[in-house]
Amino acid sequence: MVDVSDKPLSVRVAIAKGKIKLQRKTLELISEDQIAKGDVFATARIAGIQAAKQTAQLIPLCHTLPLSKVEIDIVTSADGAEVTCVARTVAQTGVEMEALVGVTIAMLTIYDMCKAVDKDMRISDVRLVVKTKSPLAAVHDGRNQSRRRYKAPLQ
């Protein structure tokens, strides 16, 4: 594991996204709460948050980070859903692996819960879209832009 003890604490934010292709009928079943395993998107959000919190146990050389925020957002479209994970910490190293793990596990949960009704699902385009680092002092003087909520789709 890399030694980060000489690095100063800073506010770190990472945003990861991915897509899951779903049949239109599957999306209808999800929206009507007709999937046998339960509320698909609520379960996926919780699974993604839990997974982000467990990243250091899943990826051997990742540092254990004190996460101050993990948010999973799911936006549907005609052919599936785009899942976004926002992770935030005040630490000496980045939080991108937590965001990537969160978004991936959220999509795998959707896959698991819908596999009985949709044999053509496909997970794709998992990527890091934002990684920021702000000085810790920015939190106290109002300069920290990472505090805003990320709801709009990012390019």
Predicted regions and their residues:
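C-terminal binding/interaction regions
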Residues: 1-41, 46-61, 68-150
